[in-house]
Amino acid sequence: MAVALLGAGITVHAQTSAKDSMRVVNLQEVQVVSTRATAKTPVAFTNIGKAELKKVNFGQDIPYLLSMTPSTLTTSDAGAGIGYTTLRVRGTDGTRINITVNGIPMNDAESHNLFWVNMPDFSSSVKDMQVQRGAGTSTNGAGAFGASVNMQTEGASMKPYAEFNGSYGSFNTHKETVKVGTGLLNNHWTFDARLSNIGTDGYIDRASVDLNSYYLQGGYFTENTSVKLIAFAGKEKTYHAWGYATKEQMEEFGRRYNPCGEMYTDANGKKHYYDDQTDNYLQKNYQLLFNHTFSTAWNLNVALHYTKGDGYYEEYKDGRYLIEYGLKPFTIDGTEVAKSDLVRQKKMDNKFGGGVFSLNYTANRLSASLGGGLNQYRGNNFGRVPWVKNYVGSLSPDHEYYRNKSKKTDGNIYLKANYDLTKGLSAYADLQYRHINYTIDGNNA
């Protein structure tokens, strides 16, 4: 399904010295090289540059921006490519696709999936991407059994600038992005910022999406060293569209029918829906990137990161057994009620942090990387029932029917090298050791 979009933008740049900026540009170019494939790596891959991304960046999620790369399939719950979208490569789902940003793992530590809805308009802050198809090179985070998507954020701008981009299209789909940057200050400092809003009514009925995000970056550069602090966040509110209509429902109610949130049908045959059948989530990401060039042959990358996620989704459920939610049956007019309609909330409060590194060597016929990382995830997931239809008795709005806490520590180290045997023949080796310790403790009502 195609979504028609119209875009417009305004950009203002100031001038700066080419000599001042050359050193900073060179430093930024050597970042995040250890997890990338090259022409001599025995891996199928596609590089997507900034210019290519800009041509298709009208607000849709990153899976849709990658939809024209080989062996890629994308889906969208709302039908507009915004909100809950998925990416498959060579038939492999998102749980087997490794995603990194600046070499830092982005996959959810428990499900191994990546929820792109929590990274709205992130492509506006991406310099380039590499998609590796099949089992890719050693990387950080979830195993890359099906594919890898390696993203590198924009480098610091050497010139002051201000930029606005907007687009509008089908189903009231819109995107507004504001970007500003200071350019190079005192030959050492740079600061950049982005604010974005994206929304759509969705192709599917009531599949509305409201997304807000920001991206902040500050950098300090010397002759051979760079330090960058990056903070980005996404806040989303999406109406559920993941229930999916059956063939029979679409034949009766139309292709855009959305069964999510349906409560009842009145005497006139009109269906009524629950207004708060929404997913609400805020995810904040922080990255501290350090790069040092020792010589033309040696460079070191070290990164620390922290991600905080907090949110919930709420839904109307009809005819549910009360005992499943830790509630006792109640009596109305002498009849015991064991099943009733209710509203439930599933909440989460998750934290993920750690560090990654890579030491890279390139000279003559040999290129090699020694890298790895150590990360820890702590999850706190729980469910509540704030309302039960016709409930008799006391019901706390904070009534909890399950809670589970998890802790996952993941460490890995890898060594890979490429050696040119002759002009047209090279040898490649890639070794990795990974250790995971995962514990979970839960209880049901």
Question: Predicted segments — roles?
Answer:
Residues 281-445:
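Face-selective signature of the C-terminal outer-membrane beta-barrel domain
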